[in-house]
Amino acid sequence: LRDPQPALAVLAQRIELSEDAELPETAVDDELLVIFANAGLQTGHAWRQRLEAWMAAGEDERQPTLEAPSFGERVLWRPGRALVIGNPERCRELLEGLAVFAWHEGHLRRLEGETAAAWEPAQADVELTQLPRRAALRRQEHVNRQVRRTTLWRMAYARLESHLEKPPLQLNGAVRRLYNELAMQAEVHDRLATLDDRIEVLQDLYELAADRLGEYRYFRGELRVEWLIVAILLLEAGLSLWELWNH
């Protein structure tokens, strides 16, 4: 994986589960827990229900479980975990597709969270886009950080967008269709459009604020120089009058 940053997908652990085995807990960041179960009569009804309950545990409206058929396999996915019921021979290729989709969707979700968290503080910074006052100069460092941060968001978005709008070429045809189905159900296209608008607004806000603060700082510097010139001229005029008075 190269975008939005270079990474390797590593199979950290592989365990054969029995029907009475304890199922894995919630995944940590950038980790995907995947359970493969045989299709048909090889997987009992009670075991299948338990696996489906494991998938549903902890889900909410923002992270519902998605279900996508893939040539006879039943694939369920949500952030951090997935369940595949089907042919064990397709385990490797399906695992690759799920890992790639989870990586890109996870970065999309992370960008959504970071920009959403920046929205309310940004409302307090709107005043910096108007004619600033002297006290506003103390927020220059904050504005500079936000300009850098929004630029990094834009760069990450640009690298991420193409991989979510279109499946990576290294996936085979069947897995690419699974990737597309998951992306459609996760409403990736609409989420990308919303994220794009949000980043654009934040970028415009802080770039304009940086310009306003820069202009105000320059104005104050020019004003100091002009007052210094006036003071020098007044001093020269005073000296001239003093010399004239003495003569």
Q: Could you tell me what each predicted segment is?
A:
Residues A136-E236, W242-L244:
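Membrane-associated alpha-helical segments
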Residues R2-V143:
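Extended alpha-helical interaction modules
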